[in-house]
């Protein structure tokens, strides 16, 4: 099996690095430190121009849970239309109810819009906030999604391997199960061979120093964030995962 590697990024420098490392697909976000939010139209358009592999844009209007109200859904619909105008290949989304189930009415609205615009859909790790996956997996298939990104309902994919394997069996080729969260060169082959997932998802994150000299004590945001350290994908971390899979 030729395992796909999807790399999540939140800047264009990381896009170049992910491509250099051998990514098969890009999940384009803003604010990966918050779990990934919707990228700007300009970023989507530029990424679509640059990328030699499919680009899927995150549709998530805010950080926090995946319970979205009427205004949020309207915003998400506009963002899906922006994705089509920008030229990306797909969208990444998920909506839940307060009871911890998939919000099928909201998802039907969003997925219908995406399908109408010829955009493929990945249902993201919102599924990992549910108590069980069996019924939700069937619902996601019913919605016409292409794949599910999941850690197997665990804190990371390595700890979720048993559920991931069961999800692959239940899916039975009707939808791709993509393992994500904590995937790296050390555990990638074990996760893939144990679960038989066709795809792995990671950021390959690292940091680089700012090109600007630090000459101020002012902070642009949280004091926990160093404005002079830029988070970027490390191309070597991506290529090392590829090498581990083929070893």
UniProtKB/Swiss-Prot annotation:
Spans annotated as Disordered: 205-226
GO-annotated molecular function: copper ion binding
Polar residues bias: start-end ranges: 205-222
SUPFAM superfamilies referenced in this protein's UniProt entry, alphabetically: CutC-like
Keywords tagged on the record: Cytoplasm
Compartment list: Cytoplasm
GO CC terms, sorted: cytoplasm
Pfam families registered for this protein in UniProt: CutC
This protein's record includes keyword Cytoplasm: yes
Superkingdom field: Bacteria
Keyword Cytoplasm set for record: yes
Family: Belongs to the CutC family.
PANTHER family assigned: COPPER HOMEOSTASIS PROTEIN CUTC (PTHR12598), COPPER HOMEOSTASIS PROTEIN CUTC HOMOLOG (PTHR12598:SF0)
Full protein name: PF03932 family protein CutC
Lineage: Bacteria, Pseudomonadati, Pseudomonadota, Gammaproteobacteria, Vibrionales
């Amino acid at each position: 099996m030729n395992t796909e590697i999807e790399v999540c990024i939140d800047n264009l420098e990381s896009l170049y690095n992910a491509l250099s490392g051998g990514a098969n697909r890009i999940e384009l976000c803003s604010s990966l430190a918050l779990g990934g939010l919707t990228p700007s139209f300009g970023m989507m358009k530029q990424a679509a121009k640059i990328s030699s592999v499919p680009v899927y844009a995150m549709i998530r209007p805010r950080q926090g849970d995946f319970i979205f109200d009427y205004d949020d859904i309207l915003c998400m619909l506009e963002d899906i239309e922006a994705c089509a105008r920008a030229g990306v290949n797909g969208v990444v989304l998920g909506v839940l109810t307060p009871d911890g189930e998939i919000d099928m009415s909201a998802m039907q609205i969003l997925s219908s819009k995406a399908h109408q615009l010829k955009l493929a859909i990945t249902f993201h790790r919102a599924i990992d906030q549910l108590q069980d996956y069996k019924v939700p997996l069937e619902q996601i298939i019913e919605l016409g999604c292409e794949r599910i990104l999941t850690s197997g309902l665990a804190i990371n994919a390595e700890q979720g391997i048993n559920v991931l394997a069961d999800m692959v069996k239940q899916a039975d080729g009707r939808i791709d199960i993509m393992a994500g969260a904590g995937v790296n060169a050390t555990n990638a082959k074990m996760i893939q061979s144990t679960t038989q997932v066709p795809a792995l998802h990671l950021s390959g994150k690292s940091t680089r120093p700012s090109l600007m000299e630090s000459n101020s004590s002012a902070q642009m945001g949280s004091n926990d964030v160093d404005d002079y350290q830029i988070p970027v994908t490390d191309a070597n971390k991506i290529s090392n995962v590829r090498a581990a899979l083929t070893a």
